Amino acid sequence: MPAGGRAGSLKDPDVAELFFKDDPEKLFSDLREIGHGSFGAVYFARDVRNSEVVAIKKMSYSGKQSNEKWQDIIKEVRFLQKLRHPNTIQYRGCYLREHTAWLVMEYCLGSASDLLEVHKKPLQEVEIAAVTHGALQGLAYLHSHNMIHRDVKAGNILLSEPGLVKLGDFGSASIMAPANSFVGTPYWMAPEVILAMDEGQYDGKVDVWSLGITCIELAERKPPLFNMNAMSALYHIAQNESPALQSGHWSEYFRNFVDSCLQKIPQDRPTSEVLLKHRFVLRERPPTVIMDLIQRTKDAVRELDNLQYRKMKKILFQEAPNGPGAEAPEEEEEAEPYMHRAGTLTSLESSHSVPSMSISASSQSSSVNSLADASDNEEEEEEEEEEEEEEEEEGPESREMAMMQEGEHTVTSHSSIIHRLPGSDNLYDDPYQPEMTPGPLQPPAAPPTSTSSSSARRRAYCRNRDHFATIRTASLVSRQIQEHEQDSALREQLSGYKRMRRQHQKQLLALESRLRGEREEHSGRLQRELEAQRAGFGTEAEKLARRHQAIGEKEARAAQAEERKFQQHILGQQKKELAALLEAQKRTYKLRKEQLKEELQENPSTPKREKAEWLLRQKEQLQQCQAEEEAGLLRRQRQYFELQCRQYKRKMLLARHSLDQDLLREDLNKKQTQKDLECALLLRQHEATRELELRQLQAVQRTRAELTRLQHQTELGNQLEYNKRREQELRQKHAAQVRQQPKSLKVRAGQLPMGLPATGALGPLSTGTLSEEQPCSSGQEAILGQRMLGEEEEAVPERMILGKEGTTLEPEEQRILGEEMGTFSSSPQKHRSLVNEEDWDISKEMKESRVPSLASQERNIIGQEEAGAWNLWEKEHGNLVDMEFKLGWVQGPVLTPVPEEEEEEEEEGGAPIGTPRDPGDGCPSPDIPPEPPPSHLRQYPASQLPGFLSHGLLTGLSFAVGSSSGLLPLLLLLLLPLLAAQGGGGLQAALLALEVGLVGLGASYLFLCTALHLPPSLFLLLAQGTALGAVLSLSWRRGLMGVPLGLGAAWLLAWPSLALPLAAMAAGGKWVRQQGPQMRRGISRLWLRVLLRLSPMVFRALQGCAAVGDRGLFALYPKTNKNGFRSRLPVPWPRQGNPRTTQHPLALLARVWALCKGWNWRLARASHRLASCLPPWAVHILASWGLLKGERPSRIPRLLPRSQRRLGLSASRQLPPGTVAGRRSQTRRALPPWR
């Protein structure tokens, strides 16, 4: 076919004989799509002439590069026509219909890759040998005719019903060898194909390499380098060594065969004819290997289909539980055709299998030569999008031009553009769907502009007016031309204003897009950091789970060993008891036997036979008694053994349960710590995001203010120019009117009182216009008044448009200003005047020659209604506006966007003003259950007597401490529990204070006296000073003024000279008490901000050292502490497990600390048990005294039940997208389940 021919043309006889003239839709029926690829779709069909099952490959040659597609189709058809071999796919014919080629071929069951997909495991070596042998025979046939397949892989090796192996998919094949084109599938490509563009040609040995890769694919379910990118795989194939089989259980023949196929140098690689003589393919194997493999695959597919059908049937019955049962078989028959999978062997009937596939459409990667269609489609889409964007940009101007045309008619065809998705997949979903022939869309002729048409009409008028008589004067024509030029200037001015606004809007959009990109990058970085932390947490959790599992297995093995030892011990004891019993029975039997013999000897008259019988009966009785005794012993031993085993198992089960509880508690503590660390990270990320958004908001506001300033300056300049021009016109008009007045009227106007100014249509007249005024008569005063009234009536429309400073406008000017500018209206109810007299005083402007401040200028331009909206916006966003004004931002009106871009801004924006706040902003959520009611301990009114007693006791003890310092520890121990409780002392606080005091005293003594060798007297003095400072600080913090007063009174009585220092200390303490909270809050916030800017590792270390308090975090982020939604301080949980045996002093201190913690826990649990056993009246008394305190509910975030979470999710999904909540759900992040 000539290169310049049209695609689908059959004028060439050589091309026409390749295709049949019949209609394929009439020849083939029951078409079902069974595969898809970049080339098109593959269909299962049945020939109506002979009921033969065939495979139809539909390929479209329409669209871009149709000639190249047509040439590929012709090449493939010619290639298939030449094939005559049992191991190649058989060609049935090719038909053309509606720019689609129907390539009809022999139908096969499927490909070798389908076998891997169905069985989910590699093939056996015998099966690989059979498949390879058949493929080699087909390749040998191709190579003997100088043909190259160039796309050999498991997906292109097909299996037929009789068990034959066939080569398929010759779309990449080459009719001539050698070849030099870059064609094939990347992972199966030979090195010489990859390097063909640089190093030259290649021959049929490239198929041998691909066959070796296919063997590895059949043996390992995927080709080498399959987990790598396609381009990287090509580089590795060309540069690295040849791949090999990974597993070691394959035979040496198979390994040698694969190594021979994968020789890197083509000259060392054997041909297909040589490989047919290899021992791997010539070894003895059952002749029904392929048939057995196909049958086994059919059975597996049938089972999968039945399972899928049962699942679908179950789903259908669940959706329609009342459906009739008689329709089940019909539903089964209808559901089975839709359960086929492209690339798998499928069974439609239980007796025999109907194939599902003919051509390889299930390979995991497409060929390289098939990527051109997708790229062409993508380029076509990009070009169409660019054309649409250009049309959208030119749209408003062209519409304006069309509106300005007069006397001319244009016909425009608005044809819709059909978009095609990348690739031609969707073109073949319906075989009966006609396809449209795309043709180049002819753009309509550009309409002539209004300027050219008006200038042409003017030139025609000028040419014709010389040949025709006219009554129009030259001055009238010149004035009309001048007015038209003025209108054109105004129109051009408005066009420039529109272009400026559009440019400003684009600049704002570009800035917002850039800032949005920064936010997305920042969000992605924070998300990666969070995911990395979560991955670390997951690794730690897995390690902990493995350790717990190892501990559990170890304990189970130890328990089993102990149980066996225990059973063996009991069995040994019982065996000894049984042996002793048997020994005793033997002795008793001998003694009894001797006694019986003696008794027989004493009575000699008894016959011998009777003696023997009597002796036998006595022996039997004795043996029976011994047997019963032995059976009773065995029964007792068995009962004892069972009882002991049950008791031991119970004991071991309790121990295992306790171990499981400890492990579970450790796991929960670890998870709580991880959640707290994650919460801290999220808080830090929130702070960083807030700062970024603040900076971006400042940048946007600065840009918006600058653009608004430029816009206002332009508007002001245009308005001043217009006002100057109108003032000049009015002066000329007024001068002409004055010149036309009679002299008597001028004299009358000059005789007016000095205090009464001469008024006109526009208010006070200028002084320069009345230089020639003379008195006028009273009769002409009425005429002047009527003229002035008429001028005022003419000025009314202009006042509604421009204010009181202008005069009347022509109707054409009103139309231009009202329609094109879009900011004025002739209705006084809709808009106020744009320019007011007192704000836009031209004389004052000319005298002062300065521009008013921008804020007042904006408010004057906006008008009263816009100023009211401004005030409303200020009320709604008062805090933000105040902060912006403090930062120096100039607030301006939001630029009116271009009409084409309004919808995009509304979609990109957040929730509108007035949207209700959700739990993510700190508000309570309806999904969270209410807190449990307070316990009965808080319901009793607390008695005031213990409070007075405690304060009096502290005051008296403080007075005593002033005289005797030995009572200072007692005062500190009493003060600590009183400070720990809100309404008085508590038992738990007292125990804690005692423990803290003793441990602190002991640790300080060991450190100072033992390590630093401090003298005991100095240590005692230091301990007293520390205790005194602690007493004063604690009493000052809780407001217990009795303690310092008692100490001061005692010291004054002992040392009167301390009065002045004590007074100074009291004054300083009062000032510190007043200013202390504010200073502490400021220092705390500064400290927290410094910590939040540190790296996560340092921040985590400081958390472990308790350098970050939850009170400070919640003060810095108050939304996280609303309505009880707060988390605990993220401090890492102490490391569990046995401590290392070392003799370091710190290790000894750690052991002592662990021992103290253990005793503290035991003491607290004993106190809790004791309190639970007390009667209610005793609990009430102890609670009123402050010795007991009710347990507070945990403020750790609670996880909602799964049902409530699903209800919340379903409710949020059922909301329509147009509602406020729906819009907010589209823009806001989903709430965590515990919120």
From Swiss-Prot:
Active site: 151 (proton acceptor)
Record-linked SMART domains: S_TKc
Keyword Membrane assigned: yes
Region of interest called Disordered, as start-end residue ranges on this chain: 318-457, 892-941, 1210-1235
UniProt note on regulation of activity: Moderately inhibited by staurosporine, a broad-range protein kinase inhibitor.
Protein modification: Autophosphorylated. Phosphorylated by ATM.
Positions of the Protein kinase domain: 28-281
Protein name as catalogued: Serine/threonine-protein kinase TAO2
Origin species: Rattus norvegicus (Rat)
